[in-house]
Amino acid sequence: MSSRRDHLVDTALKLFCKQGFRATGIDAVLAESGVAKKTLYNHFRSKDELIIATLQKRDEQFLTMARDGIARLADKQSGDPRMARIMALFDALTGWAESDQFNGCTFINASAEFPRREDPIHVACANHKKLVVQFIEELIAELKLPDSHTVAKQIGLLIEGAVVATHTAGDLSSMCLAKDTARQLLSSYAEAA
C-alpha cells in the first residue's frame, strides 16, 4: 500500500469514526489529509471503496489490539487457565472502551448507516463479525466444547451488547458484567463436557 493511500485510509477512518460515514464528505477527508482529489480517486473509485478500505484497516487494528491485549493480560487472569485468553479479551476490550479512541463499534455504526445486507459496506461489516466469532472460537478451543462455534457466537453477543451499552450509556460496568456472564457460561459448558 502506498503511503498516500495509507494516509487517506487513516484520515478517513478517524473522521468516519468521529463523525459518521455518511456525514463525512470526501471534501472533509481531503481537507484533513491534505491530499488532492485526483490522488484520492487514483486509489479509490468511490467513497464506498474508501469506506471499505477503512473497514479493512479497522478490522486489522481491532484484531491487533485484541491479540496484544490477550498477550499482555492472559497471565493476570484467575480461575480456570483454559479460559485465561477469552477473559483477557474482555479486559482488553475494557481498556479500549476506557480510551479516547472509543466511539463504539465501527462495524455496528457502519452497518446501521448502510443497512441493506447486499451493500458491499454492510457485507464488509458482516464479514468482520464472522471473523470475530472465529477468533473467539480459537480462544476457547482449549475447553474442547462440543459446539464451540455456538458458544463463540454467544460470547460474541455478550461482547456486542457490552460494547453497545458502554457506547450508548457510558457504562463501563457492562464490560465487567459481560466478562462475568461469559465466565459462568463457559464454566457451565466445561462442566457438562
Predicted regions, residues:
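Hydrophobic/aromatic-rich alpha-helical bundle segments in the mid-to-C-terminal region
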Residues: I121-N127, A141-Y189, A193
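Short, basic, alpha-helical segments at the C-terminal edge of helix-turn-helix-like DNA-binding modules
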Residues: Q56-F62
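Amphipathic alpha-helical segments used for helix-helix packing
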Residues: A97-D119
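Helix-turn-helix
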Residues: H7, T11, L15-E49, A53
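Hydrophobic alpha-helical connector segments
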Residues: A53, R67-S99, A152-I155
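Conserved acidic functional residues
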Residues: D27, N109, E160
